[in-house]
Design a protein with these regions (language model features):
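Intrinsically disordered, low-complexity segments enriched in serine/proline and basic residues
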Residues: 2-4, 8-9
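Compositional signal for N-terminal targeting/processing segments
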Residues: 11-448
Length: 448
């Protein structure tokens, strides 16, 4: 197995396609086991494919307790948010050490930790939130292989590829104290439950394991943090227009995961099949919006589009495309108007309604958010995955209907003029350039 962190490499290559057959269920258990009653399952956040791995692990075991790396102050509102799914929400908490900052837990069905809690509630499994309350939360982001690889290889080589890239926590840092605290809580839970599954970030997994095996002393809670259960955490509705900035997957793909759950259909390959459904839906909306009876986006063109997306994705060293890659290909194949239609479709999440009362709405951005009262705060995601970056793609959007009417109203056909001799020279020059180009192409073909 090879993995490179250069330029965000996320691909795993294996030389033996039958590697999965070499792995047994017992070996998997031993790999994740820490004690006779404790299993640690590291999670790559913001990935629908990895969330499915969490679901498979929970349903294949006989666990009587699920422990998650979240503070107790988040437990009640997180469970409330999960019960409101498929509507997307977020549990937010003010930081005592930084009044302008808010840390939050996205109630995203494509988050592995949310999937685990959801299955625990469904299967009546006890759920324990064991992270330490802190006055200031520090966000940890990394670069990981594409979790789509888990459909072909077991989790062990996948995690082994990530392990060399993980950095050890700084001594006496908040992160080190949190890890030691969680290891201490796991030892306490072992006295109460027979079979525990612990979900934590893949970036904390090796160090929690070390702290547990070395029996690191339990640190004292932060003096600046609120006692017992920490500062209050509240549940907020997320603005439908800003879901893309909060969800780990494309909103339309997340919708397909929830629709598959509702319809009891398979969702194992939605990370790829969902792209095809997104493309077909974007084309349908594009045809309806522009009232087109005949267009060039036939199945052959869409097949060429998918090949183009595949090539761009592999050039980015990924297995699954992101929205930027899909939009670039849509612009090249279908034009700006089709690319705009695809972006608008990708941002759509039909389950997100705004008619329920009881909790406020927050708008998300890149690291910033606008609260219900208009206050702009800095946001810290407790379930952060890979780093997000801005990338610019110029698109010409369709003019507004009002502007179209104004242009039509003020158009003066008698205000335009054309001089025939000049037009003939321009057209003849264009014809001359085309003929010369054809001649050069013909000569090149003759030489070859």
């Amino acid at each position: 197995v090879t993995f490179s962190s250069e330029k965000g490499t996320r691909c795993i290559r294996t030389g033996n396609s039958g590697y999965r057959d070499m792995d047994s269920s017992r070996q998997q258990r031993d790999f994740y086991r820490l004690g006779h009653s404790l299993t640690v399952f590291p999670v790559v956040h913001e990935s629908g494919d990895y969330a499915l791995s969490v679901r498979r692990e929970m349903l294949s075991g006989h666990y009587d307790c699920l422990a998650v790396a979240l503070p107790p102050s988040f437990q009640e509102p997180v469970i409330q948010g999960i019960e409101r799914l498929p509507e997307i929400s977020a549990v937010m908490q003010r930081e005592q050490g930084d009044p302008d900052a808010v840390n939050y837990v996205p109630i995203d069905p494509c988050q592995g930790m949310i999937m685990g809690i959801r299955i625990a509630l469904q299967e009546n499994i006890a759920c324990e939130f064991i992270d330490m309350e802190v006055d200031v939360y520090e966000v940890y982001e990394g670069t990981f292989p594409d979790p789509y690889a888990l459909k072909r290889i077991p989790g062990e080589p996948f995690l082994a590829a990530i392990l060399p890239t993980l950095s050890r926590p700084e001594p006496e840092s908040r992160r080190e104290r949190r890890i030691a605290y969680m290891a201490c809580r796991l030892r306490e839970l072992e006295e109460e439950y027979k079979d525990i599954l612990f979900l934590c970030s893949v970036m904390d997994w090796p160090w929690v394991r070390d702290a547990y095996l070395l029996q690191t002393p339990c640190p004292e809670p932060s003096l600046q943090a609120a006692p017992a259960h920490g500062p209050s955490a509240r549940l907020f509705r997320v603005s439908a227009a800003t879901l893309y900035f909060m969800l780990g997957e494309i909103p339309f793909i997340t919708y397909l995961y929830e629709k598959s759950r509702e319809d009891l259909t398979s969702d194992e390959n939605l990370s790829i099949d969902g792209v095809k459904e997104l493309l077909i839906e974007a084309r349908r909306r594009w045809v309806v919006k522009h009232n087109i009876t005949q267009h060039h986006l036939n199945p052959q063109v869409l097949q060429a589009y998918m090949k183009y997306v595949r090539n761009l994705t592999l050039m980015d060293r990924r297995f699954t495309p992101d929205l930027y890659t899909l939009t670039v290909a849509a612009k090249q194949v279908g034009g700006d108007s089709f690319a705009v239609s695809l972006v608008e479709t990708a941002k759509d999440f039909p389950y997100q309604t705004q008619d329920q009362e009881g909790y406020d709405t927050v708008a998300f951005g890149m690291g910033r958010g606008e609260m219900a009262d208009g206050e702009v705060v800095s946001l810290k995601n407790r379930l952060a995955g890979e780093r997000k970056v801005w990338r610019t793609l110029p698109l010409r959007s369709e003019p507004e209907v009002r502007k179209q009417k104004l242009w039509k109203y003020f158009w003066d056909p008698y205000g335009q003029c054309s001089w025939t001799p000049e037009d003939r020279k321009i057209e003849s020059f264009n014809l001359h350039v085309r003929e010369q180009a054809r001649a050069l192409i013909g000569e090149d073909l003759a030489r070859s």
